[in-house]
Amino acid sequence: LSNYDFSASPALPYINQELMKAYAARDIIGVSLKKTTRVKFKQINYKKPFKSPTYTKKTLGKKNFFAAKDGYLFGANNLEMQFRTFPAFQAEIIGGKAKHGKLSGDSGINSPIGKVLQGVGIREFPTRTEIANLIKRENDKFFEMLYAEYLNAGEDSKVTLDDMKKKLGKKDSNWLESKYLVTFMFNRLQGKEQKFLELAYRYAKSESEDSCVHLKAM
């Protein structure tokens, strides 16, 4: 290991460059493990270029806005990214044949989801705790905020604020937190969905530009 100087710089690009040299020489091999009976390894971030997913559409619920607490970004080849509380706010990326990983969003703009949002130029995203406290302490204000996001999302403007309260008044806090966060986020992602999906996909699969070369157990 004396051939590699990891102390020369704390910057990730430099460290990743040294790890790339060590991997090519088979001196250091990082491995991402999973519990399985049959192991097949795939090289990640080594020579083969990353294949970006292609964004196709988004929806605030597969049936309608009020029927579910989640929202989806869809991509080509049956790719979908589901956002919801479970019980923490998170995103799960699901492909046609396999699940590709999760990202947490509970801590707002400083969470993994928040980091991806920052990567596309978005600087605000509330924490789930902030929204939960608002629901508990200022319920009317929360519904006014949710209704504003609902209208900004292009949903049915014939639905009034009172209609929304009647439809969602009996939903628990976790449901409301989820719906607000995903609607807030989708409104700010308008026009940036492709870049967000690409960055989130890379992050969840440990194939981001900051990720080092490694073997992944499939």
Predicted regions and their residues:
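Short, positively charged
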Residues: 1-218
